[in-house]
């Protein structure tokens, strides 16, 4: 069985302060995108994991094995399984690659063993894995509150396009939050729905990302776009309304900017509650 394990963007992320448990209270807008890893699952004689493009992730601590352990504990099914992941999402990119793999693995196990777990049951298991893992059991658009793990599904669809800019070096989420200062946080009464409060602390750690954002701002200056950091980085992204592409003049400028900057153009993706995210056909995935 083959599945898309999609990346996500934080279209905004605001920090409301530090909680009593020493985590930070946040509100964020998650959006799944039509870019991600390819995950395959089969029943086997022994447990195994192969990760193409990132063999260093073939370890017992991989988030996929966390999903397997939770699923087995919850269902009592212990049949060995074999995983193959074609890794496209960079590590430490702010795109939730590990969380997406974990969520996709839970869904895949539910499918292959026909256990009939509801989204709510899988979301509850996902909360034990990572803060943004439960998001993937939404329709692909949601608010994340508390530490980001409490999901409020959004039904409206967005007609945006995104251009992604990766970094050769990732940013640890824990490190980014560790350097957050009170002045970086937002007021509950003054939320800005394009702002990422982690930008300032991350840019203090990574001057190269700050400079890269300034370069992108100059490159895209003639277009009505938003440029920001997703999560704790290190991925920067450009966001613009898809309708711009219907104007030949804007379309040409967009194409030029994407080409000159070497960005990856992608779109939002939604999930049918009865299925999983998909931008590939089953036959196309099987051929990889």
From Swiss-Prot:
InterPro entries, sorted: GHMP_kinase_C_sf (IPR036554), GHMP_kinase_N_dom (IPR006204), IspE (IPR004424), Ribosomal_Su5_D2-typ_SF (IPR020568), Ribsml_uS5_D2-typ_fold_subgr (IPR014721)
Keyword ATP-binding attributed: yes
Record key words, sorted: ATP-binding, Isoprene biosynthesis, Kinase, Nucleotide-binding, Transferase
Active site: 8, 132
The protein's Enzyme Commission number: 2.7.1.148
Catalytic reaction annotation: 4-CDP-2-C-methyl-D-erythritol + ATP = 4-CDP-2-C-methyl-D-erythritol 2-phosphate + ADP + H(+)
Keyword Cell division: no
Residues bound to ATP: 90-100
Single biological process term from Gene Ontology: terpenoid biosynthetic process
Alphabetized GO MF terms: 4-(cytidine 5'-diphospho)-2-C-methyl-D-erythritol kinase activity; ATP binding
Pathway entry: Isoprenoid biosynthesis; isopentenyl diphosphate biosynthesis via DXP pathway; isopentenyl diphosphate from 1-deoxy-D-xylulose 5-phosphate: step 3/6
Gene3D superfamilies tied to this protein: 3.30.230.10, GHMP kinase, C-terminal domain
Coiled coil: none
SUPFAM superfamilies: GHMP Kinase, C-terminal domain (SSF55060), Ribosomal protein S5 domain 2-like (SSF54211)
Pfam family, one: GHMP_kinases_N
Organism superkingdom: Bacteria
Described function: Catalyzes the phosphorylation of the position 2 hydroxy group of 4-diphosphocytidyl-2C-methyl-D-erythritol.
Family designation: Belongs to the GHMP kinase family. IspE subfamily.
Descriptive protein name: 4-diphosphocytidyl-2-C-methyl-D-erythritol kinase
Organism of origin: Chlamydia trachomatis serovar L2 (strain ATCC VR-902B / DSM 19102 / 434/Bu)
Organism lineage string: Bacteria, Pseudomonadati, Chlamydiota, Chlamydiia, Chlamydiales
